[in-house]
């Protein structure tokens, strides 16, 4: 009798683990989409950076956001505020925008390679800059030793955990949009390396600026949507299936 009961328990547990595996294998390892930190106020896309007027737009709260496409492009939006220990009334703040390409190595290392001429930073130090923030180009390759995608047990949404080059975990990011909300995946502000007679380069830049302007005008009409679980095996479904299997197992355990 004990052998039958033990085998039944193993079957129930195996069925539960299989259901979890089927549900997670589809998207659990994908970084595709727009991810945002807990403040849920910082997102990539035209709401953070206007490449036409080269304007960084300050969110209501600090935070971090990354977006990734399926074909190797990424975008980053960062709003950081750090305290001033000498004068708490003068916190320093920086807004950083970058985009470019990314690659994932066989050992799981994630490397972000920005487009050098497109990165921008707005730095504010009110106690030392006379109220005039510093706006400059920004170019910083980022290397993450590894990353992990999982499901937050409390909110039931996907989370992205990035680990810095030395293995230190960063603040977790939460899936906000899929497909990602991003600016065009090409050089937004190319430098003037060609002559004035280069009509193709000039036309390309005008075309890009028109594309970006339309993106800005339609910032509230993006096709990026809040990510919701649409598959049959959602986290709630798994819970009910598991509870049902455990209930049936308990009845069979008592019956035999």
From Swiss-Prot:
Q: In the UniProt record, which residues carry a glycan?
A: 103, 107, 139, 229
Cross-referenced InterPro entries, in alphabetical order? Rot1 (IPR019623)
A GO BP term here is:
'de novo' protein folding
Name the Pfam families for this protein. Answer: Rot1 (PF10681)
Q: Which UniProt keywords apply?
A: Endoplasmic reticulum, Glycoprotein, Membrane, Signal, Transmembrane, Transmembrane helix
Question: Region (Disordered): which ranges?
Answer: 186-213
> Signal peptide position in this chain?
1-24
Composition bias of kind Basic residues appears in 203-212
Instruction: Give membrane topology per the record.
Output: Single-pass type I membrane protein
Query: Transmembrane region positions?
Result: 236-256
Q: Which GO terms describe its cellular component?
A: endoplasmic reticulum membrane
Subcellular compartments = Endoplasmic reticulum membrane
Membrane-side (Lumenal) residue stretches:
25-235
Sequence ranges of Low complexity compositional bias: 191-200
A GO molecular-function annotation: unfolded protein binding
Q: Which family does it belong to?
A: Belongs to the ROT1 family.
The protein's role, per its UniProt record? Required for normal levels of the cell wall 1,6-beta-glucan. Involved in a protein folding machinery chaperoning proteins acting in various physiological processes including cell wall synthesis and lysis of autophagic bodies. Controls actin cytoskeleton polarization to the mother-bud neck and CLB2 protein stability.
Give the protein's recorded name: Protein ROT1
In the UniProt record, what gene is named as encoding this protein?
Answer: ROT1
């Amino acid at each position: 009798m004990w052998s039958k009961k033990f085998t039944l328990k193993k079957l129930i547990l195996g069925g539960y683990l299989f259901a979890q595996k089927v549900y997670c294998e589809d998207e659990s390892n994908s970084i595709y989409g727009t991810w945002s930190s807990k403040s849920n106020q910082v997102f990539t896309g035209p709401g953070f950076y206007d490449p036409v007027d080269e304007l960084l737009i300050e969110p209501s709260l600090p935070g971090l956001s990354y977006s990734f496409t399926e074909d190797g492009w990424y975008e980053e939006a960062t709003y950081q505020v750090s305290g001033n220990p000498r004068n708490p009334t003068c916190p320093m703040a920086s807004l950083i925008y970058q985009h470019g390409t990314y690659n994932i190595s066989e050992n799981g290392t994630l490397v972000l390679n920005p487009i050098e001429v497109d990165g921008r930073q707005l730095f504010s130090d009110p106690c030392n800059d006379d109220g005039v923030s510093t706006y400059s180009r920004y170019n910083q390759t980022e290397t993450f030793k590894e990353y992990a995608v999982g499901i937050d047990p409390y909110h039931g949404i996907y989370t992205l955990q990035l680990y810095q080059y030395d293995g230190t975990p960063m603040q977790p990011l939460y899936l906000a949009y899929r497909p990602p909300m991003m600016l065009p995946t090409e050089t937004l502000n190319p430098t003037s390396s060609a002559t004035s007679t280069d009509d193709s380069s000039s036309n390309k830049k005008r075309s890009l600026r028109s594309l970006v302007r339309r993106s800005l005008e339609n910032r509230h009409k993006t096709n990026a949507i809040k990510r919701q679980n649409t598959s049959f095996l959602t986290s709630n479904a798994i819970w009910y299936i598991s509870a049902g299997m455990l209930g049936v197992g308990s009845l069979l355990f008592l019956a035999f």
